[in-house]
């Protein structure tokens, strides 16, 4: 089954949705995301996710391209169109696609953010052994900043100081 996805204000079949190769989410991981669980066809704690999304966007000085009411409607429509009973809605907002790659943040009046939402069907999510009994976890050191020798696309710390 081909899913319906949401991209920049429009619904597309997933194989028809296209994003610029210059999108900063793709080139620099300059984006925020949220994942909202769906159980029994209903969004779980949508308000909490929307609040965290707004806080994340504010912290990165990114503009929010969609209102709370519109975002809720899009989530509900995607759940409906894709017949999601148990699963999730993934949302990502990037700083957009300026005309070229640059560390300097694009002018938000000249470059619109890119907003993408899609669903994933996860049947049995609520009744999985992990959901019922929990999972074991371990903690490990975060080595991201100690491994600057690896050229990853996560360049958040590169653009930030330039805009100070």
Language-model features: locations:
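Acidic pyrophosphate-coordinating catalytic loop
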Residues: 80, 98-109
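Short, flexible active-site-proximal loops enriched in glycine and acidic residues
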Residues: 46-47, 83-89
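Helix-start/capping segments and mature chain N-termini
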Residues: 1-77, 106-158
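Short, glycine/charge-rich beta-strand/loop segments that flank catalytic centers
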Residues: 67-76, 86-102
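Active-site microenvironments in enzyme catalytic cores
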Residues: 37, 81, 92-94
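A short, hydrophobic C-terminal helix/tail in secreted or cell-surface proteins
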Residues: 159-164
């Amino acid at each position: 089954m081909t899913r319906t996805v949401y991209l920049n204000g429009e619904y597309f079949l997933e194989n028809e949705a296209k994003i610029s190769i210059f999108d900063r989410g793709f080139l620099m991981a300059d984006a925020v995301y949220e994942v909202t669980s769906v159980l029994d066809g209903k969004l779980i704690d949508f308000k909490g996710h929307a609040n965290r999304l707004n806080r994340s966007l504010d912290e990165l000085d990114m503009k929010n391209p969609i209102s709370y009411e519109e975002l809720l409607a899009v989530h509900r429509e995607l759940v409906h169109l894709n017949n999601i009973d148990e699963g999730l809605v993934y949302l990502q907002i990037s700083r957009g696609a300026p005309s070229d790659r640059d560390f300097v943040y694009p002018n938000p009046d000249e470059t619109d953010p890119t907003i993408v939402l899609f669903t994933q069907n996860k049947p049995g999510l609520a009744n999985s052994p992990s959901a019922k009994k929990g999972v074991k976890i371990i903690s490990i050191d975060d080595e991201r900043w100690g491994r600057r020798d690896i050229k990853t696309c996560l360049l958040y710390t590169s653009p930030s100081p330039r805009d100070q």
